[in-house]
Amino acid sequence: MANHKNLFFLCFLIGLGLCSARRALLSSSESEAEVAAYGVNSGLSAGLGVGIGGGPGGGSGYGGGSGEGGGAGGHGEGHIGGGGGGGHGGGAGGGGGGGPGGGYGGGSGEGGGAGYGGGEAGGHGGGGGGGAGGGGGGGGGAHGGGYGGGQGAGAGGGYGGGGAGGHGGGGGGGNGGGGGGGSGEGGAHGGGYGAGGGAGEGYGGGAGAGGHGGGGGGGGGSGGGGGGGGGYAAASGYGHGGGAGGGEGSGGYVP
């Protein structure tokens, strides 16, 4: 009988030891899995934050790195949009937002990206891409399109209508300049001034009360002048056609 009791107690101890060992192994494997998952998630989050520059949504961060092929800026509701990438081949600018709208995008350097992004009322539009082949600006609220156009052989073209009391699109500059900006609806200043050393044309014409007319094309080529601004102020509704350096543009008041 004593032998049976000892054998039962021995089996009980062996079973208890096996259960304890199994529990320890399971808990250790679970903790390792949790640590591994935490490490992967942390690595992904850190990678996104660094790669995008402000994380998904852009926030108030100025996205896009400088240098060769800078990244694009993010979007952000109610925030300042992401900034453009600098360096050679800079990325595009940020998106729209609340108060200050689209970011001042456009990469500087050769092949600068376009600056997109319209803002709400009171927001600034997208910035233009600088450098050779710079891109155009975007639309906006109080201040409309960005001042596009590159300083090289790029066709600029800063398009975008402004909001109430807003400025119109910016002019395309550079050699072989691009077209001017669009009209600002009810804007104080209408179309931009398209200019450049090539055959850039200045489109525009600000509609609304007190709107200034379209900008003139010009440069060394045959840039056509912009149209006049409609609305209620004929005195300021002129398009200044022609440009410096022998441009053949023409502009006038268009009711």
From Swiss-Prot:
The answer to keyword Secreted applying to this record is yes
Tell me the Gene Ontology biological-process terms attached to this UniProt entry.
Answer: cotyledon vascular tissue pattern formation; leaf development; leaf vascular tissue pattern formation; phloem or xylem histogenesis
The positions making up the signal sequence are 1-21
List, alphabetically, the GO terms of the cellular component aspect: extracellular region
Q: Could you confirm whether the keyword ATP-binding appears in this record?
A: no
Q: Which UniProt keywords apply?
A: Secreted, Signal
| Cell compartment(s), UniProt | Secreted
Region (Disordered), start-end ranges: 63-88
User: Which phenotype arises from disrupting this gene?
Assistant: Defects in venation pattern in leaves and cotyledons, post-genital organ fusions in all aerial organs from organ primordia to young expanding organs and glaucous and rough leaf surface.
Q: In which tissues is it expressed?
A: Expressed in emerging leaf primordia and young leaves.
Q: What does this protein do?
A: Involved in leaf vasculature patterning.
Its name, as the record gives it, is: Glycine-rich protein DOT1
This protein's species is: Arabidopsis thaliana (Mouse-ear cress)
Give the gene that encodes this protein. Answer: DOT1
